[in-house]
């Protein structure tokens, strides 16, 4: 039996990538390292081309593409990044997760579904139809102050030595050896609480016990700043903080901008001050939906890069750049909807972003995971047009 080929080998031999011109080197590459190119782009400095990044793909999308020409060895997002030749980034650890998580328990198992309590403590019904649909949530682990004090807070202890047990010498060596942009997780201040409580419960708690919500946010802030600073002391340098919230729907956030500014903005400032202490002037938040009402709150707290800019929800990178100028950095912003339509629509969506990309600090890519209604041919054509327009 012949040895299985590596993903780079599959890429080099792939006929479809060659057909779409995706094996050719970047047309505007003048010798910057990946790190230099990323930093110059996000600092509004002259650059040969913008970095070539993408968000990722639904599992069902990759499964569809296997029937349309994508090698079956490419079966996850990391492998797809390598296969399509996207620019790499190095992520270093900061452990601010639960220690320990809840025990995973199957509470009920039928032909159609399974009811579980996951490692996150959430009781949920997970369907067996083979799709990655959102589970039906039944019960959340954080319902009141007693749950916070007895079940959740002990799992977030910043003094737990297990958080810091890493091969720091090896991590530091990888940072120094690879000329890649280096990112570190800076967690979440409100999105995590929503996950622990559920949307309706956290909305009610903001009114019924706002002191508890702020107490949790403060404790999480201490956990994040402590773990991030420890990691950076060990590693020495970082280029950006990578956060997550996902607290917006199509019509705006699940928390009022007033409360978000009161509770989160000054604490984001403490987190981003730690980043700046170690040379990182880029702080990104991953928030889907319509983020417009929260952008000022993030910017004032030092979170200056918005991602992934879901266009169909009303978050438009062109409008954000017009409003905020060089205060704001952008990543994403390519509406996924036209990718399922045709070449003309794909070209139009990318063309509308050219001037904003040229203005600096904007890395264009699909505004979320590529859904399974996008054909492989359409996606390759999208990559071809993006490469042509932006020199990738």
Report the location of each language-model feature.
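Segments that shape or occlude catalytic/ligand-binding pockets
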Residues: 62-103
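Active-site loop segments of alpha/beta catalytic cores
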Residues: 2-70, 114-117, 126, 139, ...
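Extended Gly/Ser/Thr-rich low-complexity repeat segments
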Residues: 124-138
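A structural signal for short, hydrophobic beta-strand segments that form beta-sheets
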Residues: 104-108
